[in-house]
Amino acid sequence: MYDLLSHLPKNLSFITRNFKKSETILDPYQTSGCLYILVSGKAAVYNLGIDGEELNIYEYCGTDCFGEIELLCGRRYPLMVRATTDCTVYLVAKRDLLQWLKEDPGFSFFLLKRMSEKLLDNSDRMTRLSLLTMRERYLLSI
């Protein structure tokens, strides 16, 4: 397993932010322009419905990262990330992320692998949901 924190480039520029439990780390209505590296704590990803309801769709813990899809695809996706415990997060600007990807094949592979894992997790979740009855989907959502 790739140890993200031990492979941070010495010249990597980032901002350290601390978030309290329940604070929003990534706001779906704002453009961040950063890769978020969760250094410590836990955070959850929520999909926001049109009525304001929140559906927990993913959880991060330990050392992980998020925000890469928006940076690399150039599309904003309306997901919110909220701290479920106190968290420390490094924010890496897009230009620094791209430089890091060019210079470190291990990091490039790690990021590709994490994106693939997220894609498979979401695909599995969608498949399981599609097999539920309407009643089961409703009960799962409350």
Which residues does each predicted region cover?
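Cyclic nucleotide-binding regulatory module and flanking cytosolic helices
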Residues: 1-23, 65-66, 70-71
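A short beta-strand-loop-beta hairpin characteristic of the jelly-roll/cupin
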Residues: 43-56
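Polybasic "coupling" helices that flank or enter modular domains
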Residues: 102, 106-142
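Glycine- and acidic-residue-biased ligand/ion/polar-headgroup-sensing regions
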Residues: 33-46, 62-63
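A short beta-loop-beta micro-motif enriched in histidine and acidic residues
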Residues: 12, 24-35, 53-55, 75-78
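A cytosolic small-molecule/anion-sensing beta-strand core signal
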Residues: 20-21, 39-40, 61, 85
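Cyclic-nucleotide recognition modules
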Residues: 11-12, 56-113, 120
